[in-house]
Amino acid sequence: MAPVDIPDRDRLIVALDLPDLRVAEAMVDRLGDSVGFYKIGYQLAYAGGLPLARALVGAGKKVFVDLKLHDIGNTVARGVESLSHLGASFLTVHAYPQTMKAAVEARGSSKVKILAVTVLTSYDDRDLADAGYRFGVRDLVEARARQAQAIGVDGLVCSPEEAAHLRGIVGPEMDLVTPGIRPAGAAAGDQKRIMTPAKAIAAGASYLVVGRPVLDAPDPKAAADAIVAEIAAARGS
């Protein structure tokens, strides 16, 4: 079972996968109090969006910096040290042992939680085979989850399809953050391992990352409210 002390609104993380800072700020204003947690990934970060993390934290929001760090240990450590000053709640690294160890050690006294990305939700067994892996998705996710927990990583980024299995492996304390969330009737897009918000929560997800179903909705605020309501209903709140 996922940790129970997270407000329903904060279980929804809206991915600000937008082209520039101005557009992202406008979306945050439009969503208002309906959203309390935002993700800043490659697109916005590389368009000058990292300062938005500080602004959001200053406004009482939570921030997930999703840069999926992966390099030699020293380089990862220096990156984590720099990014920890943004005040973010979450920071992602790829789930390779040296990368995870460096990130956990470099975090120091900051409050940022290190999340390990197991296998991207756009990958399936065939994609892994094409990349030279001898494991399928399920086995690779499980192996990386066990390594992450042993190293002291705070949580995992995984497909909602793996959430129930992983919850049984890592127990109730680790955060499970699941992209690949699509409300009923929404297009899958480039995601291959997807699930509705209610089913993901029931499977043991702690947080749901949602981008296009909110950002591209005719009324993004209403779309976010509907997802939070679905989360609350799934939890019996």
From Swiss-Prot:
Function comment: Catalyzes the decarboxylation of orotidine 5'-monophosphate (OMP) to uridine 5'-monophosphate (UMP).
Catalyzed reactions: orotidine 5'-phosphate + H(+) = UMP + CO2
Superkingdom of source: Bacteria
Pathway: Pyrimidine metabolism; UMP biosynthesis via de novo pathway; UMP from orotate: step 2/2
Lineage: Bacteria, Pseudomonadati, Pseudomonadota, Alphaproteobacteria, Hyphomicrobiales
InterPro entries on file: Aldolase_TIM, OMPdecase, OMPdecase_AS, OMPdecase_bac, OMPdeCOase_dom, RibuloseP-bd_barrel
Record CDD domains: OMP_decarboxylase_like
SMART domains in UniProt: OMPdecase (SM00934)
E.C. number: 4.1.1.23
Summary of subunit composition and partner proteins: Homodimer.
Positions with a binding annotation for substrate: 17, 39, 66-75, 121, 182, 191, 211-212
Family: Belongs to the OMP decarboxylase family. Type 1 subfamily.
GO (cellular component) term, any one: cytosol
Active site per UniProt: 68
GO molecular function, one term: orotidine-5'-phosphate decarboxylase activity
Gene Ontology biological process terms in this record: 'de novo' pyrimidine nucleobase biosynthetic process; 'de novo' UMP biosynthetic process
Protein name: Orotidine 5'-phosphate decarboxylase
